[in-house]
Amino acid sequence: MMLHAQHMPGQPGAPSLVFLHGFSGDCREWQPVGEQFHGCSRLYIDLPGHGGSTAIPVGGFADVIRLLRATLISYNILKFWLVGYSLGGRVAMMAACQGIPGLCGLVVEGGHPGLQNEQARAERRLSDGRWAERFRREPLTEVFHDWYQQPVFASLTAQQRQTLTALRSQNNGETLAAMLEATSLAAQPDLREALNALAFPFYYLCGERDSKFRALAQEVAATCHVIRNAGHNAHRENPAGVVDSLAQILRL
């Protein structure tokens, strides 16, 4: 089994870029940024429970990474950079720390490296469980209205919240809930030590108004790019700034 994806071929010898979206996004999320790198091969993946991969079930991170590997092989992508946002960034970090073959570099935007104690994990497990139950039972417009009131999204304007709520409400609540539980931050190990031992380039992007993830970026051995005029979802709020950072990272 493989994940649904959209593949755009590039020029021979150019880097291959593999993009992983955040929770409730899909393969279109990164395209305004990725399509500025038309010389590179670009693979935009739908994570399980999302987009064209809605019907693909997973029990945890191991399943997601197994599916990611199978998808890369199916497209004959043997050497690549992983670029992931939030949930996609956590999947990318997990894949990197587990030694996914062919990975040349890692770019994470607003991805959490992991909770550091059992109390924090227990609290997160309860929180994600409550959200999952709401995604299963309530109209998605109501759930996402509340979802985007969380502190991490404080920099969004009312119009941005309204737009995102309408967009994300097109998802399947049952499969979102299953993916939220399977890849909960509570189920993710603390990756700091493993990330600090990576043998390939590791870059971290965060919006200048995203104080939580700017602080987390200092806890990993990554080169940090702060994206101006942006909060947690920097590639949506300032795509040109993220394009500039990626161009510097990839030396394009």
Curated annotation (Swiss-Prot):
Single GO MF descriptor: 2-succinyl-6-hydroxy-2,4-cyclohexadiene-1-carboxylate synthase activity
Any one GO biological process: menaquinone biosynthetic process
Family according to the record: Belongs to the AB hydrolase superfamily. MenH family.
Entry function: Catalyzes a proton abstraction reaction that results in 2,5-elimination of pyruvate from 2-succinyl-5-enolpyruvyl-6-hydroxy-3-cyclohexene-1-carboxylate (SEPHCHC) and the formation of 2-succinyl-6-hydroxy-2,4-cyclohexadiene-1-carboxylate (SHCHC).
Top-level division of the source organism's lineage: Bacteria
Gene for this chain: menH
Any Pfam family matching the protein: Abhydrolase_6
Keyword annotations: Lyase, Menaquinone biosynthesis
Organism whose genome encodes this protein: Salmonella heidelberg (strain SL476)
Name of the protein: 2-succinyl-6-hydroxy-2,4-cyclohexadiene-1-carboxylate synthase
Pathway: Quinol/quinone metabolism; 1,4-dihydroxy-2-naphthoate biosynthesis; 1,4-dihydroxy-2-naphthoate from chorismate: step 3/7; Quinol/quinone metabolism; menaquinone biosynthesis
Keyword Lyase attached: yes
Enzyme class (EC, first level): lyase
Signal peptide: none
EC annotation from Swiss-Prot or TrEMBL: 4.2.99.20
